[in-house]
Structures are given as C-alpha cells and as structure tokens.
Amino acid sequence: MKQFIVIGNWKMYKTFTETLNFFDEFAIEYKKFRKANPQLIPYIDNNVFGVAPSQCNLTAYFTNRVPELKLCSQNMSKNEEGAFTGEVSARMLQDINVSYALCGHSERRRYHTNHENDESTHLKIKQSVKYDITPIICIGESKEDRDAGRTEAAIHKQLQILLDEVNIHKVIIAYEPVWSIGTGITPTPEEVENVSALIHKLTSPEVPVLYGGSVNENNINDFTKLPNLNGFLVGSASLKIDKFLKLISVNSDGIMPK
C-alpha cells in the first residue's frame, strides 16, 4: 500500500478562534468519517497528514484531539536566536510540537523577494533539520525557464543550493510549478511525474516528493497513480473539514469515500 503525505497550507485565512473551532470539529468529523467509510481506514492510517496554520495560531494545536493530525509551520527564521524582531525560530517551533515546516514557499519568494531566496531558504532548512523538524522544501521552475526548456537545469540548480550539507533523508521536496501560478494553466499529471522523477534522480528515491498546485478533492485522484509522487501540498481545499477528510483518505487504488 502506497503512503501519501497530505499537508494543508492554510496561508493567511483562519483566525485563532476559527483554528480552535477547526480542531474541535475535526475530532468529531474525523471519527464520523472513519465510521462511515471503513473501506478507507487502512489508507487513512497509512497516510501522513497535517495542517499549517498562521504563525500566531500554531498553539491552538494544543487542543487537537486527533494525534494523527500533525502540525506544520508556514515559515521559520533562518537564524537560531537573537535580536530579530518578528521572527520565529526552529527552536521555538520545536518547543510547541511542530513536526513540519514549509521552507521557500513560492508566495514567500514572490512577496519577499529581497529576503526569500535559495540561499536564505537553505539556512532555514539547516535550522529545521537541526531541531528535528522536517522541512518541506518548495521548489519549481519559472515561466521563462519552462519556455526555454530549462526546467531540468532550474530544478538541479535549486536542489544543489538547498540541499548542500543537508541530510536528504530528513527532508521532503514539494514541487510548485511557479509558471502556473496565476495563469490558469496547470501542469498535466505527465509533467508532474517528469519533474517528480527528476527530483528522485537528483536526490534519492526515498525522498518524498509532494505536488502543490491547485490540488483539491476533485482532481487529486488524477495524480495518485504517478509512481514518483508521494503526496500533496494543498491550499484552500484544506480549509473545509469535509474536503480535507477526502484528501487525507487519498489512495492509489481508486477507493472513494461514500
């Protein structure tokens, strides 16, 4: 049975109260969903899933009653500690039971171009690994690189910088095709598979590769049979409990919820 990793990136949507409500309601609905879909229990139990609330809402996770639901941070500081107002370190995140951290997300790179690049992301990755938080390293080629046929070169260059002196068996790679953001154009499963296979070739077949790009409960099954894909980084589709439950029960056998 193939294991899938499903991480819901909540971006800047839920308030602290809404986050508390999600964890409370999720515990109830998760139990109901399992009871109503016994055919999916083996897949749910085999999968790994979590959510990434906003930084100020991470401690709401203390009310979570579903141990299988892991906590992910949307970002972290490249520095260990010091006079860095507004920053949150890996050491701090470890102390509140954060299991995963997004590193180098495309939106961070886009809106913070002076500070978010491969070099700063590399430092975040090293901090994450040091404090036993699994970094979810976001990479992807630009439209210019894609149009010029430089996808492989772009991915290779990113990985060379991001994984320098990093234990690759302690990381997850998330492929975000930058060229598709805001264009209405999404990559085909074949394109996702090609890049996923490339990432495995450049790293190791044991490194989990996720796909992040307008994934939802309606199209996720288009990607589940890709041999080199190991999971999904999901955006707005993870905000609603009913949709998220369908996402975390994803499997390559085509078994659907009732």
From Swiss-Prot:
Classify the source by domain of life.
Bacteria
Annotated positions binding substrate: N9, W10, K11, G182, S214
Q: Where does this one sit in the cell?
A: Cytoplasm
Cellular component terms (Gene Ontology): cytosol
Q: Name one Pfam family in it.
A: TIM
> Part of which pathway?
Carbohydrate biosynthesis; gluconeogenesis; Carbohydrate degradation; glycolysis; D-glyceraldehyde 3-phosphate from glycerone phosphate: step 1/1
Q: Which reaction does it catalyse?
A: D-glyceraldehyde 3-phosphate = dihydroxyacetone phosphate
Q: Which GO terms describe its molecular function?
A: triose-phosphate isomerase activity
So what EC number does this one have? Answer: 5.3.1.1
Q: Which Gene3D superfamilies match?
A: Aldolase class I
Q: What class of enzyme is it?
A: isomerase
**Keyword annotations:** Cytoplasm, Gluconeogenesis, Glycolysis, Isomerase
A biological-process GO annotation = glycolytic process
SUPFAM superfamilies named among the record's database cross-references: Triosephosphate isomerase (TIM)
Q: Which residues form the active site?
A: H105 (electrophile), E176 (proton acceptor)
Q: Which HAMAP family match?
A: TIM_B
What does the annotation say about its assembly with partners?
Homodimer.
Query: Cross-referenced NCBIfam families, in alphabetical order?
Result: tim (TIGR00419)
Function comment: Involved in the gluconeogenesis. Catalyzes stereospecifically the conversion of dihydroxyacetone phosphate (DHAP) to D-glyceraldehyde-3-phosphate (G3P).
Membership in a protein family: Belongs to the triosephosphate isomerase family.
Which protein, by its recorded name, is this?
Triosephosphate isomerase
**Record organism:** Mycoplasmopsis agalactiae (strain NCTC 10123 / CIP 59.7 / PG2)
Source organism lineage? Bacteria, Bacillati, Mycoplasmatota, Mycoplasmoidales, Metamycoplasmataceae
